[in-house]
């Protein structure tokens, strides 16, 4: 800008045009605002102002020249040259310098020059400022461009972040879910691993035990075999001697007879006497030789075999001795070998020989002259008792039949004997097949029974397909043979059909009659199972059989490993040439080889050169393989299962281990029927009965005489052990069966059935008169086995059949002892009810109590200790329980109080062989529960020592030592009493007088010093526990070296202690010890009394209210120092209680000092007037007349509920006298009679007031500076932690001093109640409703009921309906109906709430209920849904619209915005606002986010862009809504806040109660020149739950010229708007748009700054113009 005339010339010439343009613009834009001008407009304004200044300079210069002439004329025109004074004056003015001139009067020109200088200076300053402003403007423009670029970049990044977050969200959820599943699987797998490892350890232990037992059994059997060999050799020697003697006697008798005949005929034959003498000796010698060779095979064994089939085993040795006496002397040499009766009788006894047991059989056992292959009687008898099922070959039936005209084949029989001998020697390692039952699934009992019957005479195909033939009937004619073939075909068909269910599929059978080739005896089935069987060297084979007599002259040594060599030697000795037999022996390998690796050794004996005889069909004996494995049918029964936990002894013989396949094949040259080695072939096994032919069930083979029952008892045992009721009943129906037969271990069928828990089998056997108390070799009876295995039903059945319940085994174990040892609770109960003796001791001195304690079974010990036997005369079912009967479900408390132990003292203190009692065992093993039960017995002697002089305490673990140390301790509850500080009506009724904090353990050796320390430590720990931040038990608190708790209480807070009713002080000592003192005085509790207001202390107040002691002392100091104190805070902040307790404390302090004191309470209500307050002050001597002397009495006045009246009206006149308490500042009050008098407040008067209000407003603020205010904020101490401390103390008291774990449901419910109070106040503060805030008082009544969490929820619903909901409703209505006027106090409309306000209230209640109350409830959702209906306002739908579609208003429509937020130079556009549930925002919607700045509504911009798009109204998608409990509910809370605090609520009245079908309209008016653009924008949803960003919609407000109209749009509320009222909403929007221009102008001119504070009341401030 120019400063001289030359430089101003161009500007001057340009000035008129600029001035004129400016004038026209000024006329048109009167309403220009400097703050809202753009850059071009500012330049225009500056040019206009510059022209004005230049024009003013020209005018000044012209006026200045004109004024100079006038001035000279005016000043010097009156002077005259004749006047010297004037000349002097003129000369003076002209001669002096300008600085030295002192004007005589005021010079207007100097003034004008000064003004011009000032203007010039201002002009220069203004030019400088304009230049600086222009540079700042440029800089600002650059910054704005950078800011816009950064905003766009930020929006792009935010959009990309939201998209990535949306993409990754489901991946994270899936990963979290998968992680949870994997963690659960890990836990399950760990548990399974632990179980498997436990089972593995048990199996290892069992395996080791079995190995030891097997090794012991092997040694025993070896010794027994040696002994039997010795006996056998002795028997052989004796037999040979007797046989030689017999031969001599027979020869002598024959000689004598011949001599007699000779002497009779001597007279007649005197001539021939000399000739006949040499011929008589020769036949005798020949006969002797023949008798020696064939004497064993006479008919004697046949008669004995029939007679001794049921004889006892003990008689076997006698039969051996008697055997030679039954041999006939004269065999029929010319007759056929087998007569007709003999032929018919050979078959029943043929399959009874078992070399699996007769391992030392020799040739003499089998050499038969008249009947082939008839076993000796002892062999027949052993077949009945032999336990080795499935391992015995039917060797007798393998003897080839001979033609009737053939001579006795001595060589062949000796070969058979050798074969039998070799087979027998290889069978000693075979196992019993019962364990094989676990390998094959058991068939149905009906199938077995059918096979049992159908195949009594049938042949079976073995597993390799080799067909065998059944024994013939007695009719051996060809016709009967044809019938036999047909019968065999039919039986084979049935067998094959049944085999599908019971055995593996048979392979193709080779040609019948062909000799077997290759390894016939291979049996891969067992080896494939790969089951490890410990101790393969021996098996349980039952009782060892008696050894048959050997052939004279044979070796007495044990059989060699390869006995077939002996067969070769014996066959070479044969003297008579007969039919040659091909002997094929397959010997088993040594038993020491592991299972699965056994090798089948096969050696073919050289065949004889004699031609083979053709097969004779008259006698076809089946060839049974020796030692073949038992198939599924042989060992499978219904109910077959592996052996259970080892009982008192080893398993029965029928429950032995796996079958080891050992194959011995025999091939006859007469009838070459090949026998498979893998075919099951034991005569007494089930498979023989089912698939072969059985003598006892074959009527076709009955040829006279009783059928032999060999193997039936063993089969009976197997059926009983496996629970096959069908087979067992069939066997029991057979005649002559010994049901009491016992195997080698002494296990009978009844024992096996009871051991395996087969109740039906036990009942069948008991009904069949089985011996109920038959004991095994270890003395265990069936009742012992059932009790040990836990089969209580079998125990009941055996007891019902009068079993001996007190039977003691060899080791002294009774059934009760075994049941206790195995922890079988039901069996123990049954035995005790049967009256068993609990005091029976074992050989080691153990009692059932020892056994129960040794296993750590608490239930078993409780039954032994407390279960009473029924009285005589009452049955078990008729017995009525006694009042003190023990119940296992009662737990410890039930057994302590009512039941008395029935175990005598001597039994509970009985010591075993080592001197250990049951308490020793329990303490040493750490069974604390068992030891505790034993300690409850009054007669327990814990000081009893064992043989090593150790007491129970010496061998106990740490836990048990602690229990023993507290054994005789008295548990006295320690309680804290607050005395007379019970507030009653002055405060909270939920305070408790006494609280149990712990239980003191007082021992006999406890001293009074120890007792004092224990009480002090317990109090300190308790104070620390209730003031800590978490749930800690007293055992977890280690506060010995820590400072005092946060509440300020310690052992020094104790006033007195009472032991029962006897007062006691810390450190005091009585003559008796504490233990004796407590017992003598029957002190049931120790009560600690805290010092309270009566003693001038606040300790009891602190404990009762949980307000820290230091803060209470501070409040008391404020009252005593300032005299005027007001306690204010939210309702329920214990203001009245605190004031009253402080008053009590002050009163007792003053009384202790010798002053009288009085407390005056006054409850203020709406009708309480100032006159009443004056009378109160005067009557209480607080106000005394000026004339009266001061009083010494202390007066404490408490004004309660001051919030119900106006403080300024009530206390306004008392402020100055209360602040200056002296006669110098009196106040005059008028009495009721009209007289007035001067009064003043004296120094001994204290005034306390309580206000249940968060903050003061209006005129009440004038009172604030005259009082000392104590604010009790809900979010600050002492109120903030008071509820937590109080509820924690309540829980500790409920649990009698033992704080539960944080996971306990009670702790969770208490934490929930605490969280509800915090969240509720936080939400109410966020809503801007401080009047609805609540103190902790209402939550102090939270119920603490263990196990009943629903009680707390019901209490919360009642609290919500009675207190919280009405306060919130009142506060929300107050906010919604506020008329906001600038500079004035808010006034509440008294009209009833409108429909929209009711909707606001319902929405607020629903949000608070779900966000603050129900959120975090530990109840399950299903349980919580049952109580939601009890809460008021819980039915309001929270599916509020969460997304809006942007739509411009139609032409001619206007809307008013409640909150204007504009950004300069933003073009209008249409944006589709996405749903809140989807994080990916559109690009345009993201670009137009509004900056949330406080003064954003003050920025305006001119828009010259026309709106080119009009969006129609659209329906809201009902699926795009807020879900229950989402984070976006806080957005609705903020929207409610902004709605309630806005100036215009034209649309609130249109809100329905609860409608989700909503429609929203946004409209803008279009004009020819300008149109307002509407951008529906929103802030991104915050991820923080505490303060989510609210969603706002912002627009740009444009200011147009005189040709345009101002168009302002309005933010719509997020509350539901019904569809039916869309027209009303639209019309109302039009009406409100008419005045929007004026209101908006006023807003822009008058509002300097508008801050949206959610916690304070908004006010509009006017700036000074």
Curated annotation (Swiss-Prot):
* Phosphoserine modifications at: 1526
Keyword Ribosomal protein annotated: no
Residue ranges annotated as coiled coil are 120-277
**Where does the record say this protein resides?**
Cytoplasm, Cell cortex; Cell projection, Dendritic spine
The source's domain of life comes to: Eukaryota
Q: Name the keywords, alphabetized.
A: ANK repeat, Cell projection, Coiled coil, Cytoplasm, Methylation, Phosphoprotein, Repeat, Synapse
Per the record, where are the segments of Low complexity compositional bias?
455-469, 1590-1604, 1623-1641
Q: Can you provide one Gene Ontology molecular function annotated for this UniProt record?
A: protein phosphatase 2A binding
A GO-annotated cellular component? FAR/SIN/STRIPAK complex
Q: Where is the composition biased (Polar residues)?
A: 388-399, 410-429, 470-480, 1656-1665
Database matches in CDD domains: bZIP (cd14686)
Looking up InterPro entries in the UniProt record yields:
Ankyrin_rpt (IPR002110), Ankyrin_rpt-contain_sf (IPR036770), Cortactin-Actin_Reg (IPR050719), Cortactin-binding_p2_N (IPR019131)
What does it do?
Regulates the dendritic spine distribution of CTTN/cortactin in hippocampal neurons, and thus controls dendritic spinogenesis and dendritic spine maintenance. Associates with the striatin-interacting phosphatase and kinase (STRIPAK) core complex to regulate dendritic spine distribution of the STRIPAK complex in hippocampal neurons.
How it assembles, according to the record, is: Interacts with CTTN/cortactin SH3 domain. Interacts with STRN, STRN4/zinedin and MOB4/phocein; this interactions mediate the association with the STRIPAK core complex and may regulate dendritic spine distribution of the STRIPAK complex in hippocampal neurons. Activation of glutamate receptors weakens the interaction with STRN and STRN4.
Name it.
Cortactin-binding protein 2
Q: Which organism is it from?
A: Dasypus novemcinctus
Instruction: Tell me the gene name.
Output: CTTNBP2
């Amino acid at each position: 800008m120019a400063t001289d005339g030359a430089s101003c010339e161009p500007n001057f010439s340009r000035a008129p045009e600029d001035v004129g343009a400016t004038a026209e613009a000024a006329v048109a834009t009167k309403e220009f605002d400097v703050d809202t001008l753009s850059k071009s407009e500012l330049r225009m304004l500056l040019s206009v102002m510059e022209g004005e200044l230049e024009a003013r300079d020209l005018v000044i210069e012209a006026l200045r020249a004109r004024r100079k002439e006038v001035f000279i004329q005016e000043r010097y025109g009156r002077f005259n040259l004749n006047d010297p004074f004037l000349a002097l004056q003129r000369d003076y003015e002209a001669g002096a310098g300008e600085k030295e001139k002192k004007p005589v009067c005021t010079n207007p020109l100097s003034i004008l020059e000064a003004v011009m200088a000032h203007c010039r200076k201002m002009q220069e300053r203004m030019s400088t400022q304009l230049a600086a402003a222009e540079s700042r403007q440029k800089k600002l423009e650059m910054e704005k461009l950078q800011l816009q670029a950064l905003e766009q970049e930020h929006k792009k990044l935010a959009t990309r972040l939201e998209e990535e977050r949306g993409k990754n969200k489901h991946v994270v959820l899936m990963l979290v879910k998968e992680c949870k599943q994997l963690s659960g699987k890990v836990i399950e797998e760990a548990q399974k691993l632990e179980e498997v490892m436990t089972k593995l350890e048990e199996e290892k232990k069992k395996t080791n035990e079995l190995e030891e037992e097997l090794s012991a059994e092997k040694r025993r059997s070896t010794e027994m075999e040696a002994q039997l060999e010795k006996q056998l050799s002795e028997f052989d020697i004796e037999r040979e001697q007797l046989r030689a003697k017999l031969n001599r006697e027979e020869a002598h008798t024959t000689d004598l007879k011949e001599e007699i005949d000779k002497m009779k005929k001597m007279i007649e034959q005197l001539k021939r006497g000399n000739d006949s003498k040499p011929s008589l000796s020769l036949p005798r010698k020949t006969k002797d030789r023949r008798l020696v060779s064939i004497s064993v095979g006479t008919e004697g064994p046949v008669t004995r075999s029939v007679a001794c089939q049921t004889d006892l085993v003990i008689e076997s040795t006698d039969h051996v001795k008697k055997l030679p006496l039954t041999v006939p002397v004269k065999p029929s040499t010319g007759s056929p070998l087998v007569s007709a009766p003999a032929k018919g009788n050979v078959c029943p006894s043929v399959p009874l020989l078992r070399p699996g047991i007769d391992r030392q059989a020799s040739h003499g056992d089998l050499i038969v002259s008249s009947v082939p292959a008839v076993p000796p009687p002892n062999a027949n008898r052993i077949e009945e008792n032999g336990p080795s099922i499935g391992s015995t070959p039917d060797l007798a039936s393998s003897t080839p039949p001979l033609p009737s005209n053939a001579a006795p084949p001595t060589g062949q029989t000796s070969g058979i004997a050798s074969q039998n001998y070799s087979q027998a020697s290889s069978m000693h390692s075979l196992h019993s097949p019962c364990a094989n039952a676990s390998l094959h699934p058991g068939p149905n009992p009906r199938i077995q029974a059918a096979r049992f019957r159908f195949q009594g005479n049938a042949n079976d195909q073995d597993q390799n397909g080799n067909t065998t033939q059944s024994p013939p009937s007695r009719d051996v004619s060809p016709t009967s043979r044809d019938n036999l073939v047909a019968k065999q075909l039919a039986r084979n068909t049935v067998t094959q059909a049944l085999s599908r269910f019971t055995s593996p599929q048979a392979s193709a059978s080779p040609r019948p009659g062909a000799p077997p080739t290759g390894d016939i005896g291979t049996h891969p089935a067992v080896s494939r199972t790969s089951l490890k069987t410990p101790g393969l060297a021996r098996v349980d084979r039952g009782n060892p059989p008696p050894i048959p007599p050997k052939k004279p002259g044979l070796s007495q040594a044990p059989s060699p490993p390869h006995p077939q060599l002996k067969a070769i030697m014996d066959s070479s000795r044969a003297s008579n040439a007969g039919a040659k037999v091909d002997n094929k022996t397959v010997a088993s390998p040594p038993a020491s080889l592991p299972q699965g690796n056994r090798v089948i050794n096969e050696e073919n004996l050289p065949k004889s050169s004699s031609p083979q005889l053709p097969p004779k069909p008259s006698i076809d004996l089946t060839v049974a393989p020796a030692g073949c494995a038992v198939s599924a049918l042989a060992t499978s029964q219904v109910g077959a299962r592996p052996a259970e936990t080892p009982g008192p002894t080893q398993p029965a013989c029928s429950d032995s281990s796996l079958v080891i396949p050992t194959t011995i094949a025999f091939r006859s040259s007469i009838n070459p029927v090949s026998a498979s080695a893998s075919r099951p072939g034991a005569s007494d096994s089930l498979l023989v009965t089912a698939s072969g032919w059985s003598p006892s069930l074959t009527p076709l083979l009955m040829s006279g005489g009783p059928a032999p029952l060999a193997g039936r008892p063993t089969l009976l045992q197997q059926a009983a052990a496996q629970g096959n009721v069908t087979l067992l009943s069939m066997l029991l129906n057979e005649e002559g069966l010994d049901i009491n037969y016992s195997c080698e271990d002494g296990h009978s069928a009844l024992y096996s059935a009871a051991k395996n828990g087969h109740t039906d089998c036990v009942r069948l056997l008991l009904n069949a008169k089985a011996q109920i108390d038959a004991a095994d070799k270890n003395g265990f009876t069936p009742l012992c086995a059932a009790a040990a295995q836990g089969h209580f039903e079998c125990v009941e059945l055996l007891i019902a059949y009068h079993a001996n319940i007190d039977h003691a085994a060899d080791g002294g174990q009774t059934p009760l002892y075994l049941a206790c040892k195995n922890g079988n609770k039901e069996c123990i109960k049954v035995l005790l009810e049967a009256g068993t003796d609990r005091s029976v001791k074992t050989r080691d001195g153990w009692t059932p109590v020892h056994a129960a304690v040794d296993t750590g079974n608490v239930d078993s010990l409780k039954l032994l200790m407390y279960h009473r036997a029924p009285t005589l005369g009452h049955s078990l079912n008729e017995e009525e329980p006694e009042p003190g009967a023990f119940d296992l479900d009662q737990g410890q408390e039930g057994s302590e109080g009512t039941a008395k132990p029935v175990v005598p003292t001597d039994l509970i203190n009985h010591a075993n062989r080592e001197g250990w009692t049951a308490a020793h065992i329990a303490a040493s093993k750490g069974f604390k529960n068992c030891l505790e039960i034993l300690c409850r017995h009054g007669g327990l002697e814990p000081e009893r020592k064992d043989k090593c002089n150790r007491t129970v305490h010496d061998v106990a673990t740490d836990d048990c030592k602690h229990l023993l140390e507290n054994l005789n301790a008295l548990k006295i509850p320690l309680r804290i009493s607050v005395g007379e500080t019970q507030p009653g009506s002055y405060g909270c009724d939920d305070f408790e007088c006494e609280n149990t904090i712990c239980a003191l353990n007082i021992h006999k050796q406890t001293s009074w010093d120890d007792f004092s320390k224990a009480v002090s430590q317990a109090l300190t720990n308790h104070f620390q526990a209730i003031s800590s931040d978490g749930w800690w038990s007293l055992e977890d608190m280690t506060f010995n070296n820590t400072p005092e708790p946060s509440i300020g209480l310690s052992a020094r807070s104790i006033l007195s202690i009472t032991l029962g009713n006897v007062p006691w002080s810390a450190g005091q000592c009585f003559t008796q010890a504490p233990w004796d003192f407590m017992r003598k005085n029957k002190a049931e509790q120790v009560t600690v009394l805290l010092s309270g207001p009566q003693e001038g202390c606040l300790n009891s107040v602190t404990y009762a209210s949980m307000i820290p002691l230091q803060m209470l002392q501070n409040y008391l100091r404020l009252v005593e120092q300032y005299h005027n104190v007001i306690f204010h805070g939210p309702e329920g902040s214990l203001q009245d209680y605190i004031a009253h307790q402080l008053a009590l404390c002050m009163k007792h302090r003053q009384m202790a000092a010798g002053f009288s004191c009085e407390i005056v309470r006054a409850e203020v209500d709406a009708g309480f007037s100032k006159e009443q307050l004056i009378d109160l002050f005067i009557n209480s001597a607080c106000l005394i007349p000026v004339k009266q002397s001061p009083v010494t009495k202390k007066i404490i006045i408490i004004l309660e509920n001051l919030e119900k009246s106006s403080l300024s009206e009530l206390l306004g006149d008392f402020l100055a006298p209360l602040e200056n308490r002296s006669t110098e500042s009196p106040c005059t009050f008028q009495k009721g009679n009209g007289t007035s008098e001067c009064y003043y407040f004296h120094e001994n008067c204290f005034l306390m007031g309580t206000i249940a209000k968060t903050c003061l407003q209006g005129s009440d603020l004038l009172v604030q500076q005259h009082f000392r205010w104590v604010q009790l904020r809900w979010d600050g101490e002492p109120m903030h932690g008071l509820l937590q401390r109080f509820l924690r103390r309540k829980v500790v008291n409920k649990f009698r001093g033992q704080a539960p774990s944080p996971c306990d449901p009670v702790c969770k419910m208490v934490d929930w109640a605490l969280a509800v109070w915090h969240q509720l106040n936080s939400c109410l503060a966020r809503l801007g409703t401080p009047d609805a805030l609540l103190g902790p008082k209402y939550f102090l009544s939270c119920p603490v009921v263990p196990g009943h969490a629903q009680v707390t929820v019901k209490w919360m619903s009642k609290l919500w309906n009675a207190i919280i909901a009405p306060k919130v409703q009142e506060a929300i209505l107050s906010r919604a109906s506020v008329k906001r006027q600038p500079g004035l106090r808010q006034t509440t409309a008294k009209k009833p709430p409108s429909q929209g306000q009711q909707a606001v209230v319902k929405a607020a209640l629903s949000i608070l209920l779900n966000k603050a109350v129900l959120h975090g409830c530990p109840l399950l959702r299903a349980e919580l849904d049952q109580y939601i209906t009890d809460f008021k306002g819980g039915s309001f739908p929270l599916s509020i619209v969460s997304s809006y579609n942007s739509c411009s208003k139609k032409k001619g429509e206007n809307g008013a915005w409640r909150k204007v937020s504009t950004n300069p130079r933003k073009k209008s556009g249409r944006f589709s606002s996405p749903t809140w549930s989807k994080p990916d925002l559109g690009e345009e919607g993201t670009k137009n986010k509004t900056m949330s700045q406080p003064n954003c509504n003050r920025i305006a911009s001119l828009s010259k862009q026309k709106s080119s798009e009009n969006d129609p109204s659209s329906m809201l998608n009902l699926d795009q809504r807020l879900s229950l409990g989402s984070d976006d509910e806080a957005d609705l809370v903020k929207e409610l806040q902004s709605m309630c605090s806005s100036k215009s609520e034209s649309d609130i009245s249109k809100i329905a109660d609860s409608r989700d079908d909503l429609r929203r309209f946004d409209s803008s008016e279009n004009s020819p020149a300008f149109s307002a653009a509407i951008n529906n924008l929103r802030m991104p949803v915050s991820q923080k739950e505490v303060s989510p960003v609210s969603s706002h919609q912002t627009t740009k407000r444009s200011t147009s010229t005189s040709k345009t109209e101002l168009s302002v749009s309005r933010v719509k509320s997020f509350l539901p708007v019904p569809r039916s009222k869309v027209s009303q909403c639209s019309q109302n929007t039009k009406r409100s748009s008419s005045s929007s221009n004026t209101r908006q102008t006023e807003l822009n001119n008058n509002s300097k700054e508008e801050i949206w504070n959610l916690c304070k009341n908004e006010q509009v401030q006017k700036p000074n113009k």
